[in-house]
Amino acid sequence: MAASTDMAGLEESFRKFAIHGDPKASGQEMNGKNWAKLCKDCKVADGKSVTGTDVDIVFSKVKGKSARVINYEEFKKALEELATKRFKGKSKEEAFDAICQLVAGKEPANVGVTKAKTGGAVDRLTDTSRYTGSHKERFDESGKGKGIAGRQDILDDSGYVSAYKNAGTYDAKVKK
């Protein structure tokens, strides 16, 4: 069997992949998606001797009939099954040691994960300094919204009759 340091690294990798993508996961059980990711990221599934289909079949073999996840012991059994297929010329123990070294200490890779793109149209639509017309009046210079003051013209109807607006401005218009 593999050395105890390899087993510690193997268990650590199992836990990291088990919680990958699931904030509520405890790290005690791994689902099929994370098992496939582990095999792909750690180069266990090379596409020639071990394919993605093989990975899924082994997962189905080692998990319980109604279970959807595997624990650490089932994980080791699954690695043993894949080891003989991945390293054909070696004995079971040598193949398991080799596959443990592939997996031990690895973490889920986030390369190839798509990022939010900001293209020309997106920049133009979200940059408030480029707004024109009435939309321009809804934001101040810093780009912060003005609230209702930017959406409605607020009239000063402080006159004493409905037709008389802007009280106190008559004296400024009429010179004595």
UniProtKB/Swiss-Prot annotation:
InterPro entries: EF-hand-dom_pair, TPP/p25. Residues 134-144 have a biased composition (Basic and acidic residues). Its main location: cytoplasm. SUPFAM superfamilies: EF-hand. It comes from the Eukaryota. Gene3D superfamilies: EF-hand (1.10.238.10). Expressed in endometrium during the mid-secretory phase (LH + 7) (at protein level). One of its GO terms (biological process) is decidualization. The modification N-acetylalanine is found at A2. It is found in: Cytoplasm; Cytoplasm, Cytoskeleton. Keywords: Acetylation, Cytoplasm, Cytoskeleton, Microtubule. Residues 132-152 are annotated as: Disordered. Pfam families: p25-alpha. GO terms for cellular component: cytoplasm; microtubule. One of its GO terms (molecular function) is tubulin binding. Belongs to the TPPP family. Regulator of microtubule dynamic that has microtubule bundling activity. Required for embryo implantation; possibly by regulating beta-catenin. Also required for decidualization via regulation of beta-catenin. This is Tubulin polymerization-promoting protein family member 3. It comes from Homo sapiens. The lineage of its organism: Eukaryota, Metazoa, Chordata, Craniata, Vertebrata.
